[in-house]
């Protein structure tokens, strides 16, 4: 039989309806996170992402977005096998043996003889991040949903000590994907830096936090930068951060904080140059310190105001704003 192309015979669901469903799911996600129901909150986020993916697939006349979401979910689940292998001293099999049992084929064509489980897991998470971006087709609504799912992992890290590192790493995947889709999403950049600080990946944390501060300065981001530079032992940068924090707290700056404007090059010049592989000063400080004042501060809201989301005929480019009053402790 000759192959035939199947086309849609009904008009696709309108963007207003898609928006309404996403708002409902994000609100339920927020309510569940307030009750520390992280898994249920995450499921709401994933289902919202699936609804967006299906709407995009129908409009594009293909089937790429939803399968990409499924591939991302599977890759993150399978990445845990490498973590479990490391915790069991490799008793679950070698890296190549573990990869052979997986659906994710990102490493299947490589010689994995000398590849550690942790490195393999890194590639799985990178693959998942790219598939999440493919799922949304760079749709800004997707960035909001990815941010919410990242929040579920961040909250999980606060309640489940056994899975703390995996929760940090998965939160990084979703925050990073959200930021790639919408570079102006300040909260995603700040939370990405916050999670990277927990993993002591200070150079990457600096990139995220500097980007967040340059996008929209806030006292929360300045506090995170203060903690970052404290760990690096960078006294001049700590002094700069302290001045920025003070500028938000002075009575004269209640309306508009007096924040010094720096170019990216000027900003980075105040940071230390750390050679590759050289540990930063004070990098052994634990995030989970009992001294709460020295911890990085997490921001649980969005800086974006709620906006009216108008539909577009083909590839929409909507403003974000689902999180105006959500995700606040």
Predicted feature locations:
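Canonical positions in the second alpha-helix
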Residues: 48, 135, 177-178, 211-212, ...
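Alpha-helical solenoid repeat scaffolds, predominantly canonical TPR units
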Residues: 25, 32, 44, 51, ...
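Residue at a conserved register position within TPR or TPR-like alpha-solenoid repeats
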Residues: 32, 153-156, 160, 196, ...
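Short coil turns that delineate tetratricopeptide repeat
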Residues: 46, 53, 140, 183, ...
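Amphipathic alpha-helical repeat scaffolds of TPR domains
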Residues: 20-27, 49, 55-115, 126-129, ...
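Alpha-solenoid helical repeat scaffolds
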Residues: 59-61, 147-148, 187-191, 220-226, ...
């Amino acid at each position: 039989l000759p192959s035939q192309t199947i086309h849609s015979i009904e008009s696709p669901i309108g963007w207003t309806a898609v928006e309404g469903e996403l708002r409902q799911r994000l609100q339920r996600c927020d309510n569940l996170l307030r009750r520390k129901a992280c898994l249920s909150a995450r499921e709401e986020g994933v289902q919202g992402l699936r609804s967006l993916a299906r709407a995009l697939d129908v409009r594009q006349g293909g089937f790429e977005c939803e399968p990409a979401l499924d591939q991302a979910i599977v890759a993150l689940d399978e990445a845990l096998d490498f973590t479990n292998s490391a915790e069991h001293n490799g008793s679950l099999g070698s890296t190549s043996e573990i990869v052979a049992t997986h659906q994710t084929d990102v490493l299947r064509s490589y010689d994995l003889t000398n590849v550690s489980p942790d490195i393999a897991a890194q590639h799985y998470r990178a693959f998942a991040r790219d598939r999440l971006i493919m799922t949304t087709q760079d749709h800004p609504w997707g960035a909001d949903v990815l941010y919410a799912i990242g929040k579920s992992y961040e909250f999980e890290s606060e309640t489940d000590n056994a899975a703390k590192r995996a929760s940090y790493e998965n939160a990084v995947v979703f925050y990073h994907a959200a930021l790639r889709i919408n570079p102006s999403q300040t909260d995603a950049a700040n939370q990405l830096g916050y999670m990277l600080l927990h993993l002591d990946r200070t150079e990457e944390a600096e990139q995220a936090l500097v980007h967040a501060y340059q996008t929209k300065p806030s006292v929360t981001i300045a506090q995170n930068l203060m903690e970052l530079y404290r760990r690096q032992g960078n006294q001049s940068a700590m002094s700069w951060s302290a001045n920025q924090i003070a500028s938000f707290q002075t009575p004269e700056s209640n309306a508009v904080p007096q924040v010094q404007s720096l170019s990216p090059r000027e900003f980075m010049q105040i940071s230390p140059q750390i050679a590759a592989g050289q540990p930063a000063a004070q990098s052994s400080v634990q995030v989970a310190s009992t001294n709460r004042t020295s911890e990085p501060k997490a921001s649980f809201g969005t800086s974006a105001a709620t906006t009216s989301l108008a539909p577009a005929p083909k590839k929409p480019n909507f403003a974000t704003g689902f999180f105006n009053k959500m995700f606040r402790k």
